[in-house]
Structure formats: structure tokens, C-alpha cells
UniProtKB/Swiss-Prot annotation:
Protein name per the record: Flagellar hook-basal body complex protein FliE
Family the UniProt entry places it in: Belongs to the FliE family.
Keyword Cell membrane: no
Keywords: Bacterial flagellum
InterPro entries tied to this protein: FliE
Amino acid sequence: MSAIQGIEGVISQLQATAMSARAQESLPQPTISFAGQLHAALDRISDTQTVARTQAEKFTLGEPGVALNDVMTDMQKASVSMQMGIQVRNKLVAAYQEVMSMQV
């Protein structure tokens, strides 16, 4: 009897999993646009640079609680994010030029 109950328990778990999967499929998925994602990435790059600039200004003015290593870390993060943004832009321009050179 215990083997049958064990199998019934497994079957009920599988049925519950299948029902939850169907429920998740029926929910409308939010639309994510390429332009929206690109705009959000540019905003994050801008925010990173703003934070670095603000930290550098605070350190220059001698405000307490702002350490040089934090300023340098923020400046490096801003630099790396800007370089990444430039590389993404270069790849997008190259892809656009390749598409435009295709013959229809």
C-alpha cells in the first residue's frame, strides 16, 4: 500500500507542476523593446558618470566620509562603462552598415 501512495504522491506533484506551468504560459509577457533597453543602458552609463563626478567633487571639497579609494573606484567604473558604451555603439554602427550594404 505504501508504494501505491508514493506513486500517487508523485503523480499529484506532477499534475500540480503541469497546472502551474499552464498558468504561467497564459500570463501576458511584458514587451521589451530594443530601443527601450538601449535607452536604459545609456541612462545607467550617465548615472555612473554623474556619481563619479559627484564623488570627485565631494573629495575635492574635503567632505568627511569620502575616501580617495572610493573616488578612484567610481571613476574607474565610469570609465569602463563609457568604454563599453562606445564599443556597443561601434558594433551597432557596423551592423547597420552591413545591413545597408546588402542587396535586396
